């Protein structure tokens, strides 16, 4: 959610194009995954613009096929001389066709970090979040959705992790059609 100088929170994003390149660039001043030489990854960038705010958003999707990993980041570029305020940016929206997953997270405290908590998805919203301005052992910005029959060696698991996080919110919502939405 972006707020313009007049207080408006309305954005009209239009598709402008895409870029496809080998490798993955490092994020400036943030820890990140990367592939400087273009041998392990391929990146798709989708470019969206708002002509009224003079805002460009670059949605970067990188696959590391050897590791079965998709990495995503978003760039917000203010092309105007006006102040824009970024109020909220969700990292992902993923819709799954059913909700037959277990929600697995790791919470804890100093000297007993990463205690495993596993619960079945249920109707409504399940979430983990933190307003501490940093990752911590209390609420780790990682979770996974696993089929109940999954073992260490086989089965279906989706893992979600912020590589760099301040405040964060991870939510899974199960609707009345028994589908799951991850945000």
Spans of model-derived segments:
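Polysaccharide-binding surfaces and accessory modules of carbohydrate-active proteins
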Residues: 1-182
């Amino acid at each position: 959610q972006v707020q313009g100088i007049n207080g408006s929170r309305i954005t009209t994003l239009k598709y402008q194009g895409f870029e496809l390149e080998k490798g993955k660039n490092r994020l400036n001043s943030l820890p990140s995954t990367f592939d400087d030489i273009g041998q392990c990854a391929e990146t798709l960038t989708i470019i969206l613009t708002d002509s009224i705010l003079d805002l460009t958003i670059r949605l970067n999707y990188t696959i590391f096929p050897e590791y079965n990993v998709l990495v995503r980041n978003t760039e917000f570029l203010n092309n105007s001389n006006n102040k824009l305020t970024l109020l909220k940016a969700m990292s992902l929206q993923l819709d799954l066709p059913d909700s037959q997953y277990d929600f697995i997270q790791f919470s804890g405290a100093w000297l007993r970090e990463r205690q495993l908590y596993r619960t079945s998805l249920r109707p409504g919203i399940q979430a983990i979040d933190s307003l501490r301005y940093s990752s911590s052992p209390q609420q780790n910005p990682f979770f996974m959705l696993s089929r109940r029959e999954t073992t260490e060696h086989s089965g279906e698991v989706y893992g979600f992790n912020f590589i760099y996080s301040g405040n964060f919110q991870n939510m899974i919502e199960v609707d009345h059609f028994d589908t799951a939405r991850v945000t």
